[in-house]
């Protein structure tokens, strides 16, 4: 890994642009070392890692897919981002930190990279810390491999991150299916399918699933439709 550029925000964190390429082939990814606003990093440490070079989805509000899709990252390439951030913080210990969140949500769609699942298992082994929280953010693509991928993700959550130590986020962006299609321009689960999966996902003690929305200018969220589709017992 070669760091190409580092950008810092005082009191918040650092964004790294890294080249994972070999033999002259450039493979650029971003990852972030940060904290939750208003919470000291000593209490909550947040790492955001990439799962792909670029992204094949092309969401309207995201620039990760602007240069196209450059391939999936390996387990070692994903965990390498975590290890790099750990080395940059010698006064902090991933294994002893009271709360450290590793969010697979920077560049790429995690469910389109099969290596994300073994990376999650490897992370739990490498950082055996009850304060470790793993997180995935997804647009829920509709492909033949995604449904079994999510079922396996349930098993990873139950086996490696029980007791509320896993956070699953769905990037929906609209409660209107037609409008959502313009924001996330790929085939994907319908809203009712996301809701049904959420019911299967939840076990006692689990974190609620998070719904993310990024409406554009002049676009309004239909709160009533969201509440009608998504049970607040399972979603927030």
Features from the language model and the residues they span:
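Surface-exposed beta-strand edges and their flanking turn/coil or helix-capping segments
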Residues: 32-33, 42-46, 62-64, 75-77, ...
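A structure-centric signal for secondary-structure junctions around beta-strands
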Residues: 13, 28, 43-44, 56, ...
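Flexible, acidic/Gly-rich N-terminal and inter-domain linker regions that tether
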Residues: 1-45, 49, 57
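Short, flexible active-site-adjacent loop segments at beta-strand->alpha-helix junctions, enriched
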Residues: 22, 35-37, 53, 108, ...
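Conserved AdoMet/S-adenosylmethionine-binding subsite of the radical SAM
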Residues: 86-236
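Amphipathic repeat-derived elements
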Residues: 18, 36-48, 78, 95-97, ...
């Amino acid at each position: 890994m070669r760091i190409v550029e580092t950008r810092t925000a005082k009191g918040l964190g650092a964004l790294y642009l890294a080249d994972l390429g070999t033999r002259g082939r450039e493979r650029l990814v971003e990852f972030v070392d940060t904290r939750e606003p208003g919470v000291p990093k000593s209490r909550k440490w947040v790492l955001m890692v990439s799962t792909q070079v670029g992204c094949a989805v092309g969401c309207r509000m995201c620039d990760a897919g602007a240069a196209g899709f450059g391939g999936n990252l390996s387990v070692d390439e994903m965990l390498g981002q975590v290890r790099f951030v750990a080395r940059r913080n010698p006064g902090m210990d991933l294994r002893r930190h009271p709360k450290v969140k590793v969010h697979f949500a920077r560049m790429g769609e995690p469910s389109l990279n099969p290596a994300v699942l073994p990376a999650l298992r490897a992370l739990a082994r490498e950082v055996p810390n009850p304060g470790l929280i793993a997180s995935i953010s997804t647009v829920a693509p509709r492909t033949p491999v995604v449904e079994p991928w999510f079922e396996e993700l349930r098993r990873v959550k139950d086996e490696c991150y029980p007791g509320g130590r896993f956070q699953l986020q769905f990037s929906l962006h609209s409660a209107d299916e037609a409008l959502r299609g313009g924001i996330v321009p790929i085939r994907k689960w319908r809203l009712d399918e996301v809701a049904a999966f959420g019911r299967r996902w939840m076990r006692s003690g689990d974190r609620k699933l998070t719904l993310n929305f990024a409406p554009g200018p002049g676009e309004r969220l239909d709160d009533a439709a969201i509440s009608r589709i998504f049970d607040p017992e399972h979603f927030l």
